[in-house]
Amino acid sequence: MLSYLLRMAVKSLKRNPILSALIVCGIGLGIAVSTTFITTYHLMSSNPIPHKSDSLYYVEMDNWDPARGWNDDKPGAVPNQITYRDMIEIMKSNIPTHQGGSFKGSLYVYPPAQVARPFKVVARMCFSDFFALFDPPFQYGSIWPRSADKGPEQVIVLDYETNQKLFGGQDSVGKTVRVEDRDFVVAGVLKPWQPQPKYYDPHNGAFEKAEQIYLPFEFLRPWELHSAGNTSGWKNFGENFKEYLASEAVWIQMWVQLDSQKQKEAYRDFLNAYVNGQKKLGRMLRPTNNKLLPVMEWLKEEQVVPEEATSLMLISLLFLVVCALNLIGILLGKFLARAPEIGVRRALGASKRAIFLQHIFECEVVGILGGALGVLLSLLGLRAINTLFEINFRFHLDVKMVAAAAGLALVAGLIAGLYPAWRICSIQPAVYLKEQ
């Protein structure tokens, strides 16, 4: 049956190739536009760490001005980072499986003169648990031990590109890298790792590159290192670095791993008890509003996917519907031109159902051809987006989006062909038999 319907559809398409090509192009254009913008939305809103996103939680606490909330436009909103003093205290908990605060810093690397000139890097100042939390893959070596956090010991993890630049991509574990005024021993080298979106710290761009080097957090003290990301506060930051660390400035991203509901409840109780203790000391005087946000909820709060992306996706789907509706008239004219032939077939015993299925199948063949054309055009569209917009993210078609394009093509073919197929199968054979 299917082979017969396919032969009939191909024969019909060949009968008027120009008109058939016009219909295919119409569906192809609609598929191209819709697939392009659905793909951008899909990739921007994808889960960056699906195997453990439900056990990673971003910690938020409200240390803001008692007289005025963090965001007047969003009642209940709290600062999206925490203070250094709060990080130190809550990291004393042994409830989380893994935990750690981190921030982005700007430092200079001084390679040997024969290798390269000194260059500036973006560093992630973090604890050993950072790597256990977010699972960046290692090419050489491994994470530094937790004991190195306390010293802190002069150990470093390099990203793939920095290792290429300094050591030509060779195993550099055990070798030294000079950062600022200190020599650090390489503990590990990452494989290429660019989580998209950059969920662990999206504050300066959810699609920016991951950091180039990773260092123990407490080196911020000897260097008096300030964050290269966002820093907010409602009080004076102090006159020196020590006062800055003790201030109400928020600039640290705090994550914990809680693998069970029991852990989560216990940790929430711990945070509430900590905040209540701070209230007695005259801090955190706003209503207690601690938050533990899983990865996808955190990304939603940070509005990682811009509203424009959602709007463009919806508009592109409407454009596809318009393309399909505009093809109804063309298909209707094409089918009705064969009305005498269909009248004879009906008189010879062909059922309405058979005629309807034949023409619907032809529309779906057109839809599939248009879908194939649309996928090719969407590849060009995504390439144009990658070229025009300078972000550290490459939009590409994956298997899900190709399948979505195929599904949309079939739906578009059905929308365009349903009414014309119904009209042609409803003709009265007697009218055309008289004409014959």
How would you label these PLM feature ranges?
Residues 16-50:
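Short, strongly hydrophobic transmembrane alpha-helices
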Residues 325, 332, 340-386, 403-412, ...:
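Transmembrane alpha-helical interface segments in multi-pass membrane proteins
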Residues 20-21, 312, 376, 399-407:
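Hydrophobic alpha-helical transmembrane segments
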Residues 63-80, 101-129, 144-156, 178, ...:
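Short acidic/polar micro-motifs at solvent-exposed secondary-structure junctions
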Residues 37-111, 117, 248-253:
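Membrane-proximal extracellular/periplasmic loop immediately following the first transmembrane helix
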Residues 128-143, 154-302:
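Mid-to-C-terminal secondary-structure elements
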Residues 3-4, 11, 15, 275-315, ...:
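Membrane-helix entry/capping segments
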